[in-house]
Amino acid sequence: METFWRQWADPRERLKWVQKLVTENPRHPFTFLWRSESWAGVAARRNLIGLKLKRDEPLRIKLIKGILSEQYPKGGFRSSIGWTGLRLFQLAELGTPPDHPSIQRALEWLRKRQDYDGSLL
């Protein structure tokens, strides 16, 4: 993907290209992500094409707060290893710092469920 975007090193050129794409081809799969207010939409715009849009910042903060509000006091999400892993991935994609206390608590919760060989129980 990096090679593809190299042709538009300037983020403003990337933005123009994406805006043209979603305008001219409303059925293009990226159109959904471009307009999405989900974590996937924000993450795609931030990480996939490298656009940190001003319009996304309040939404990004709202999504992070929403995810963190679901965390149980002991650190897990829905008492599930898979769900906790997914939430950690989402938080990372949304740009939450790895040293955030809630992320550290979730990682510790996962470590406590790890077997001696590294597998999760």
Where are these regions (language model features)?
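Preference for long, amphipathic alpha-helical scaffolds in soluble/luminal domains
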Residues: M1-L121
